[in-house]
């Protein structure tokens, strides 16, 4: 299964979310190929810390040019995850045919391919959208995200209509306390989004929490049993998302609390 994270709006946590989902799936025992198509390089840096600073020959640009991942993957520092590192050479191949990535990805060997894309819309992003079995767009509830979500929807319908049914959105930077106030900016934009888009995963609310930065910057794990509310909510959100993509039914204990395959990741 190929999962593409795509958002034209930068700063919504797209790369971190891709990492969190990939790590949760890997912790469940699935074999993951992480394909970093974002020239910001943050996912590559996260997965290859302590391995190498640059990958001049093993990278996404070389893989796309030669239409194969064989010889271009790197074993990451996280068990069960290999990565095709990002490269600034992506700028040189922006005119590449949008079928290239689909021809490049391996048919077997991995349970999931997770693709991180740049916050833009070009042929490289089209490659990632076209290759996807599931497209995930994190949205922060504001006017800028509404505008870019409309833009992405229009381009999907115009250029990749067969992928529209595979596209889903979910809320990020969610503040649970604001749910109590119907006139809060969050609540008002949630109503606008839900009126205009029918593809919102309302059960996925990625919280606004320092635990997100700690996860990628200090390797501090998140846990559904954490005493820190932010860590707990982050772990729950990505367990729910992992359950959706793996089609795993969420179980509950006798008190109605959700039970997940992975407590800590």
Task: Label every PLM stretch briefly.
Residues 1-265:
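P-loop NTP-binding core
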């Amino acid at each position: 299964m190929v999962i593409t994270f795509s958002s034209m709006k930068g700063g919504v946590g797209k790369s971190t979310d891709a990492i969190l989902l990939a790590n949760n799936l890997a912790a469940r025992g699935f074999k993951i190929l992480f394909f970093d198509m974002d020239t910001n390089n943050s996912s590559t840096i996260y997965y290859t810390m302590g391995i190498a600073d640059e990958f001049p020959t093993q990278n996404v640009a070389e893989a796309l040019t030669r239409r194969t991942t064989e010889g271009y993957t790197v074993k990451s520092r996280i068990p069960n995850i290999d990565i095709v590192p990002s490269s600034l050479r992506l700028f040189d191949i922006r005119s590449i045919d949008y079928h290239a990535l689909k021809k490049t990805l391996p048919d077997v060997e991995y349970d999931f391919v997770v693709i991180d894309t740049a916050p833009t819309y070009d042929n490289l992003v089209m490659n990632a959208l076209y290759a996807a079995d599931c497209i995930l767009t994190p949205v922060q509830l504001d006017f800028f995200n509404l505008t870019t979500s409309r833009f992405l929807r229009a381009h999907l319908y115009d250029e990749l209509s067969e992928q529209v049914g595979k596209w889903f959105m979910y809320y990020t930077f969610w503040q649970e306390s604001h749910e109590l106030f119907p006139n809060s900016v969050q609540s008002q934009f949630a109503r606008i989004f839900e009126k205009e888009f029918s593809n919102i995963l309302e059960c996925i609310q990625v919280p606004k929490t320092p635990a997100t930065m700690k996860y990628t910057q200090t390797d501090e794990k998140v846990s559904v049993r954490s005493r820190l509310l932010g860590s707990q909510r982050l772990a729950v959100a990505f367990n729910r998302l992992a359950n959706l993509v793996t089609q795993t039914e969420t179980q509950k204990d006798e008190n109605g609390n959700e039970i997940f395959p992975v407590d800590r990741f």
